[in-house]
């Protein structure tokens, strides 16, 4: 049988759209699941994804990528990455696997929703491949850390995090439930693939792979690079969906979805990626600061993408840019202080050399966060460990599910943004978090953050120990501690004496 060239049949297969006859169009694509906004079927046929592939091509490429990822892992199993890596890098692996691995299965659901309920045939076609991509990512990122479980119980949280009530896991689940499992097909295309994957994770994986290579962890570098090549393809589904909405008079609705998702993604990105780049990664392995990464890879790309589509930058853009300078430093300090509530060991990252680097990258760092670290360092050196460990829980944002933070020092700016809705008082970490809630209160109003649950009596006993048990920690070995066992404080002794 003769093989027809791809160009003869590809457009027909990717654009095939059945005209329903046994059911109505609305029954086939209900608005609640589809999100078509009343745009008729024939309009959605103009959807044109920029990255095209066929099933035979997909299978061939994926087979090669899987063979490469698993063979590199097998070849490097004797490299003793765990034993030879800096503890800060090991913490990077733990936080990544716990926050992302099982979340990939939520992404399978999102891609499946587009594959079934999107009116655009091109979207359904690409989402089918995206669904298989995300399944692959989940399997890879559960298999790779499994070998470390026998050496370190915290690696078991690659699987357990999403099955727990740990605060960072709650934050991640709340976000992914919002932009994936709790949204219609077109909202998923915009909020997941455009705002989160194209805007954040696609670029982050490039940076993470580079950092892994610098740290000598070629197994993880190869894994992340393999995943990123999938992301770069299926992340392209949101752009054409936005373009189609704009062309059919739905620009305002499209803009709002983008604005909501970018902010939600940013807050989670700041707490998971910012500390990794500026504090956990060993100083000699840092290729650039988190701020430099954001401006080089994220900000410019978002601006170009939005302008090309005919959308505006989000109304909070100036607040976003200010956040890039400040937010993750405060998040890092909070995570380190409440380290017992994390499934990884936060690295302080504040030796004299690291502080010089932070001051160079973020002028004024020493006058703000540095002052707090001075007090922490002094307490550690004087064996006042009770003053560098928590006794209760912090205030937590009802949107991001992350503790409320501000800038310390002379620029102290902590502010709580509250809202009373249906007789309940909600607290938010920023004006934008509150705005997101107001756009869709039904989506968020019944959720209780970790502190809400504590105050409602769901956590017993009402102590830090009770909270740790509620979060799912089964032993002290699983609870976070300082990654370097406070060895960094000894390096600060000469500087502290000179200051005194």
From Swiss-Prot:
It is an enzyme of class 1 (oxidoreductase). GO terms for molecular function: metal ion binding; toluene 4-monooxygenase activity. Inhibited by Zn(2+) and Cu(2+). It catalyses: toluene + NADH + O2 + H(+) = 4-methylphenol + NAD(+) + H2O. Component of the toluene-4-monooxygenase multicomponent enzyme system which catalyzes the O2- and NADH-dependent hydroxylation of toluene to form p-cresol. Also able to convert benzene to phenol, catechol, and 1,2,3-trihydroxybenzene by successive hydroxylations. Pfam families: Phenol_Hydrox. This is Toluene-4-monooxygenase system, hydroxylase component subunit alpha. Changing residue 201 to A: Strongly increases consumption of dioxygen in the absence of bound substrate. Disruption phenotype: Cells lacking this gene show a complete loss of toluene-4-monooxygenase activity. Optimum pH is 6.8. Pathway: Xenobiotic degradation; toluene degradation. It comes from the Bacteria. Its cofactor is Fe(2+). Coiled coil: none annotated. Its EC number is 1.14.13.236. Signal peptide: none annotated.
């Amino acid at each position: 049988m003769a093989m027809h060239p791809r160009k003869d049949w590809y457009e027909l297969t990717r654009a095939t759209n059945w005209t329903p006859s046994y059911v109505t169009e609305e029954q086939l694509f209900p608005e609640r699941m589809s999100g078509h906004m009343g745009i008729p079927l024939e309009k959605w046929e103009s959807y044109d994804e920029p990255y095209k592939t066929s099933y035979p091509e997909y299978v061939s490429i994926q087979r090669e990528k899987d063979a490469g990822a698993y063979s590199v892992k097998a070849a490097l199993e004797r490299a003793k990455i765990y034993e030879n890596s800096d503890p800060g890098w090991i913490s990077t692996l733990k936080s990544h696997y716990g926050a992302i691995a099982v979340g990939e299965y939520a992404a399978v659901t999102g891609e499946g929703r587009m594959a079934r309920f999107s009116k655009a045939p091109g979207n359904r076609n690409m989402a089918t491949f995206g669904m298989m991509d995300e399944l692959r990512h989940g399997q890879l990122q559960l298999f790779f850390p499994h070998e470390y479980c026998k050496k370190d119980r915290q690696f078991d949280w690659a699987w357990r995090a999403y099955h727990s009530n740990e605060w960072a896991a709650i934050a991640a689940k709340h976000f992914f439930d919002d932009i994936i499992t709790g949204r219609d097909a077109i909202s998923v295309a915009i909020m997941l693939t455009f705002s989160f994957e194209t805007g954040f994770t696609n670029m982050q994986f490039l940076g993470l792979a580079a950092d892994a290579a610098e740290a000598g962890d070629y197994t993880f570098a190869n894994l992340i690079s393999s995943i990123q090549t999938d992301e770069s393809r299926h992340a392209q589904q949101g752009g054409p969906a936005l373009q189609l909405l704009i062309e059919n008079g739905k620009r305002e609705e499209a803009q709002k979805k983008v604005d909501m998702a970018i902010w939600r993604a940013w807050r989670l990105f700041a707490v998971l990626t910012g500390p990794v780049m500026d504090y956990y990664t060993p100083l000699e392995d840092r290729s650039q600061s988190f701020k430099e990464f954001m401006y080089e890879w994220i900000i410019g790309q978002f601006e170009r993408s939005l302008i090309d589509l005919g959308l505006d930058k989000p109304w909070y853009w100036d607040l976003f840019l200010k956040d890039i300078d400040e937010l993750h430093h405060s998040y890092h300090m909070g995570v380190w202080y409440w380290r017992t509530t994390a499934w990884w060991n936060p690295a302080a990252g504040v030796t004299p050399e690291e502080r010089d680097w932070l001051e160079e990258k973020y002028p004024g760092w020493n006058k703000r966060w540095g002052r707090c670290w001075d007090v922490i360092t002094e307490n550690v050196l004087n064996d006042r460990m009770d003053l560098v460990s928590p006794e209760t829980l912090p205030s937590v944002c009802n949107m991001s599910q992350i503790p409320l933070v501000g800038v310390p020092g002379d620029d102290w700016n902590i502010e709580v943004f509250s809202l009373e809705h249906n007789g309940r008082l909600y607290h938010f970490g920023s004006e934008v978090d509150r705005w997101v809630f107001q756009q869709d209160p039904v989506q968020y109003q019944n959720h209780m953050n970790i502190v809400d649950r504590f105050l409602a009596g769901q956590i017993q006993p009402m102590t830090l120990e009770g909270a740790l048990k509620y979060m799912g920690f089964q032993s002290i070995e699983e609870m976070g501690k300082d990654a370097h066992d406070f060895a960094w404080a000894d390096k600060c002794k000469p500087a502290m004496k000179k200051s005194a």
